[in-house]
Amino acid sequence: MAKETAVEVKIEDRTLKLTNLEKVLYPEAGFTKGQVIDYYTRIAPAILPHTRDHPLTLKRYPNGVDAEFFYEKNCPKHRPPWVKTATVWSGGNNRDMYYCLCQDLPTLVWLAQIATLEFHTSLSYASNLPEPRTMVFDLDPGPPATIVECCKIGLMLRDVFAEHGLDCCAKTSGSKGLRLYVPLNTKVTYEETKVVSKGLAQLFEEQHPDLVVHKQLKELRTGRVLIDWSQNDQYKTTVNVYSLRARARPTVSTPVSWDEVEKCLKAKDPSLLVFNSDQVLARVAKHGDLFEPVIKKKQKLPKSLVAATGGAAALEKMANRRHSTSGRLRKPPAK
């Protein structure tokens, strides 16, 4: 058995032990753990504003992308004492969960050191979990559809948002699809974003039945784009922008411009929206953070969009149901 190699490094005011830097985590690309750590170190100025203060689910691949992996919601007990956590009540587990918070470069490097290839974050701040910062649409193609078809649907969604005075940003999933983020950063609830996103997905399916589905049933998805609205949920996390993906090669969930989305659709070339770690670092050096509006732009969810998607009736029904069951709802224990 090869002897484990280790090196001690000083990052800001923290000391970290890095091990097995030569271990290959992406066999097809020969991409090592050391290169994973290097990528996250160099992308830190872009990724940290998007991870900071958001509960984080780790997707870890200790033996590489071709081997077993696991999701980790509870921050590892062996974490350094300076890694911050967020306490989140889990109704399903009937207990508190302690999510990692990726607040700074030392934490980011430590997470990469324990083979966290993918970073999945909540849409909320840990300090205000009931309120999402953004509304998300995950466009997932069912083969033989590709990201090209996702681009078509994405542009149509963008135009709908524009009609209601909303801007939105696009990023690749780093896998097969495209994701649209509507910045909010104002007072809003998941009930509101969920009914609007679901209503819009249903409308698109009604108007474009050959192109779109809104349910995740596999038999419905062949050749169509799933508009997955279900990520708009207080108890879910979704892959963070600039996160590596555990594919054959080290692709990245990458912000893209609408010009690039249009170009991909026109050329019908999915490869135009596939970016590896080196390409993403070069893009950020040239263009900055194309996803910055997601965390900085403030937009209210317009009543016109709520009405257009049937959200008003759905919200009223939810409110009535809440009122009728308010005395029976189980609450987490008092702190």
Language-model-detected regions and their locations in the chain:
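Active-site loop/lid in soluble adenylation, ligation, and acyl-transfer enzymes
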Residues: 2-130
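Short beta-strand
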Residues: 59-61, 168-174, 215-219
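A short beta-strand motif that forms the metal-chelation/ATP-contact edge
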Residues: 179-185, 226-229
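Long, highly charged amphipathic alpha-helices
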Residues: 42, 152-159, 195-203
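Signature for HUH/AEP ssDNA processing cores
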Residues: 98-173, 184-186, 190-192
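C-terminal accessory nucleic-acid interaction domains of nucleic acid-metabolism proteins
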Residues: 1-30, 37-38, 52-53, 114-134, ...
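Short secondary-structure junctions
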Residues: 49-51, 161-167, 208-209
